[in-house]
Amino acid sequence: MRTSYLLIALIAAIAAAEKYAMVFGTADGWGNYSITSDPCRTYDDLIKAGIKPENIIYMTYTSDLTYASNPFKGMIFTDPAPNTDGDWAKYGCFDHVDYTDKDINKKVFLGILSGDAEAVAKATGKENPKVLAAGPEDTVFTYFIDHGDVNMLYIGGGHINVDQLLAVLNTAYKKQIYGKWVWFMEACHSGSMFLNLPSDWNIYVMTSADFAHPAKMSNCPPNDKVAGKSLDTCLSGLWDNSYLDYLEQHPKTTIGEIVDAVMADVKKTSAQGVSEFGDMSFRDLPLSDFFGLLPTPSFRITRAAPESIVSLDQVPMHLAKWRAIRADKDEMASAVAEYERLAFESAKREVEVMRLGVSLMNEKAADAALKTASESYSASCVRDLSLALHEKCGHSFPFSESAMNLLRNICLPGLSVPNVNWSDICM
């Protein structure tokens, strides 16, 4: 009899458990097209997989839909195609956006993750803002895409560091506003955000890159054509499309199976180092426990292998080059001028990073430090030097892989931020 009661209780608990999801695409602009397209695709798949719209929190920009040079207003794509059948907006993702524009900032993001409705209401003016409010028996799936650097993520116009992210995850754990939580995160150096994630918080994370590498975009020019028209941007993230393609073809996959498959797939064309963190027992669980179960067979055809793969820090230069290549006579001068401007800025950043290096070590050591990353480093030192280069010299994020290599070699374990005369470094 006792066994029967326990079985009934277990079945009741499973039936009562809910699935929740959060989708974050927190960078704006046509050059960040994939930070709008892949979240839309993820949202649409979550709905197709049975997640209730009211159980999904969706943060994204929508300006790409009306961008002046967008040849397909109101549409969004992740793959090149001979027609517009691959438009993800037609499934309704943008009808369900909870946070956009000025509400995309670190205060709102951290408030959502920690279940702090009062803080989010104060920051947004929303009367009943959606925040994480699952229960201790519920599952949560989170997809995030934006730029990143070592121990930093960018949210809108600001950034958060690794300590802030781990603090809100700890708050959510203590508040019991989730049962089990799976994160899929796309950002350069995203692995650096979870190196110290405890394994007993019931959280599992797959990141698009390890601590040392930038992420890469795919379907960039010249592989950016839809219905015969060039979009002049990168349509998707390499890792993002890999996991979505695999999931749509293998809806009953376990977490371990999809992670292993994506690691192998991305490794064919990139050394970015897809990584995993947290509670490794999650690998045996069906991803459908978190994402829901997509229709079988897949509603999409198998896509071709990704092409035109570009490191995220090189995307602006790559896009400017192809705009100049494709420009007609009326647009040629301005397109080439923009490419020249970005080339000069890239050269300036490279020189300033090297000037920083030779101010702290000899020239041969600095040159070697550009080429190989130190595996052990002071995260706070790297963060502070990165921000100083941004604020003092005007460097843009994400930094190049070589620049991050140098900063990690400057910031060896136990060392504080060196004294730097930035007037001697910045040009």
Q: What is the predicted role of each segment?
A:
Residues 13-427:
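Cysteine endopeptidase catalytic domains of the caspase/legumain-like
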Residues 2-17:
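Cleavable N-terminal signal peptides of Sec/SRP-targeted secreted and luminal proteins
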